[in-house]
Design a protein with these regions (language model features):
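Gly/Ala-rich beta-loop-alpha elbow adjacent to hydrolase catalytic centers
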Residues: 138-142, 146
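Catalytic active-site module of serine/aspartate enzymes centered on a nucleophile-bearing elbow/loop
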Residues: 245-263
Length: 263
């Protein structure tokens, strides 16, 4: 009698490495998130449509000002973690579109560098129909996503919190004995893209950031064209409240985004 047992499914080494490295980069929270209206009064649940056919959950928080901010999250959690910052921006007159990438917060698909770029483009397409002036805000890994989008579709302003030169450089700092360049397929080479930026740039870094050292953020900033501004938050580590949504960070973002409204 012939065996019905299935043979194991082997992946080519390069694809296997790619699958494994993504598990070390992306840390999505499982399950869905609550309704936007329960987060902030007037919040709207919206759906983004990507070019490759995915439907992604998002929140839109309208405000009275002229500008909207497209927020690109970091590599962990979901948009609920960024709600306090979104609320602070709305209180200061900035509308906010806050979305989750593929594979995050119950969204279909699996995250990858090109996939997250497609998700950000879908967010920009949606926001184009709801605001005349759009600024981008990206944190950590999301800073690389926002920068790539900014080169493709220039915003009124680009604001990056804890950005890095490349994911390869971050990996080398944390794993100096590993051949990081050979292991990573998602490299997020922001340093190679930023010279083509055509928008005002704000970079915010934590002086004690243990995940993305401020030196990497400064190197990226130094490679960018003018106009630009660099802000160092004293004593702040990567996930400290003062760097996530502290008063200084909120004030810098609001000031920079609103300055882009002036002719």
């Amino acid at each position: 009698m012939a065996s019905t047992r299935k043979s194991p499914r082997w992946l080519p080494p390069r694809r296997l490495i790619g699958a494994l490295q993504r598990r070390l980069i992306y840390f999505p929270s499982p399950g869905s998130v609550r309704s936007a209206a329960t987060v902030l009064r007037g919040g709207q649940d919206v759906v983004l449509h990507t070019d490759d056919g995915l439907r992604l959950g998002a929140w839109f928080f309208p405000a009275d000002g002229h500008s909207a901010v497209l927020m690109c999250n970091g590599n962990a959690g979901d948009r609920c973690m960024r709600a306090p910052l979104a609320a602070a921006l709305v209180r200061n007159g900035l509308s906010v579109l806050l979305f989750d990438y593929r594979g995050y917060a119950g969204n279909p698909g699996r995250p990858s560098e090109d996939g997250l770029a497609a998700d950000a483009r879908a967010a920009r397409t949606w926001l184009d129909a709801h605001s005349d002036r759009i600024a981008y805000l990206g944190e950590s890994l999301g800073a690389a996503v926002a920068l790539r989008l900014a080169v493709e579709h220039p915003p009124s302003a680009l604001m990056l919190r804890s950005p890095f030169t490349s994911l390869t450089d971050v990996g080398r700092l944390h794993y100096p004995r590993l051949p990081v360049a050979q292991l990573l397929s998602d490299r997020y080479p922001s340093i190679d893209r930023i010279e083509n930026l055509g928008a005002p740039l704000l970079v915010i870094a934590g002086a004690r950031d243990s995940i993305v050292p401020a030196e990497l953020s400064r190197r990226l900033y130094d490679a960018a064209p003018e106009p630009k501004r660099f802000v160092l938050v004293p004593g702040a580590d990567h996930n400290d409240p003062e760097l996530l949504d502290g008063p200084e960070v909120v004030a810098e973002i609001v000031r920079f985004a609103q300055a882009s409204e002036r002719p």
